[in-house]
From Swiss-Prot:
Alphabetized UniProt keyword annotations: Mitochondrion, Ribonucleoprotein, Ribosomal protein, RNA-binding, rRNA-binding, Transit peptide
SUPFAM superfamilies named among the record's database cross-references: Ribosomal protein L6
PROSITE patterns according to UniProt: RIBOSOMAL_L6_1 (PS00525)
Name of the protein described by the UniProt record: Large ribosomal subunit protein uL6m
Species assigned in the record: Schizosaccharomyces pombe (strain 972 / ATCC 24843) (Fission yeast)
Length: 213
């Protein structure tokens, strides 16, 4: 296992993996633009790369992600970069360039998650709509005959600051946003009165009622 932070800081550390048996085609250089963008990394973040598995550890926890072996990772002071060896980049396939940008985006999200959490805010809009927490579950009173009971995932934290709002937090952005979408699905905002469950500042998209003459 390699640890970036355990190595000398006098020069960039780069993990380079040999390229074997790849087929290459041309593609737009724009696909690699996102991949080349730098990531600002706090001092208390640790990276460990073993094979195609990259582990990111910070004050709020640890995340693991796939890191393709045709990419390399370098860190100088607080700057982290995802790159390709020059001879690979010249002939990289469209899929490889797309994965370069995707890998960089996921890595940036994971760094933010273990540093300061991802957050999603849920708001209930409707007369009598209420929500509460009990025994690891969210209770939703949203106009049905029975309350909706939603189990809280172990890797998502939930707060209930008001009777009509929830705050979701977690280190994994995808899990936080997926759970927010699940909660919203129980009462999607309706287009005439605006009742429903709203996520992250979502605004009502109201339709005008048609009059019958």
């Amino acid at each position: 296992m390699f640890s970036i932070d355990s190595c000398l800081k006098t020069r960039p550390l780069t993990f380079r993996i040999a390229r074997l048996g790849m087929n290459f085609t041309t593609c737009s250089a724009a696909r690699s633009y996102v991949g080349k963008k730098e990531i600002i990394v706090p001092k208390n973040i640790q990276f460990d790369l073993e094979g195609e598995q990259l582990q990111i550890t910070g004050p709020h926890g640890t995340l693991n992600m796939r890191f393709p072996n045709y990419l390399n990772l370098s860190k100088t002071n607080d700057i982290l970069k995802v790159g390709m060896d020059a001879n690979i980049e010249k002939q990289a396939t469209k899929k490889q360039r797309a994965m370069w940008g995707t890998t960089r985006a996921i890595l940036a999200n994971n760094v933010k998650g273990v540093t300061m959490y991802w957050q999603s805010i849920i708001k209930l809009v409707g007369i009598g709509y209420r929500t509460s927490l009990n025994d690891g579950n969210i209770h939703l009173k949203i106009g049905y005959a029975n309350d909706i009971l939603v189990s809280i995932p172990t890797d998502v934290q939930v707060e209930n600051p008001t009777p009509t709002s929830l705050v979701l937090r977690g280190i994994d952005r995808q899990k936080v946003t997926q759970f927010a979408a699940k909660i919203r699905s129980f009462k999607k905002p309706e287009p005439y009165k605006g009742k429903g469950i709203y996520v992250d500042g979502e605004k009502p998209q109201l339709k005008a009622k048609r009059s019958i003459s």
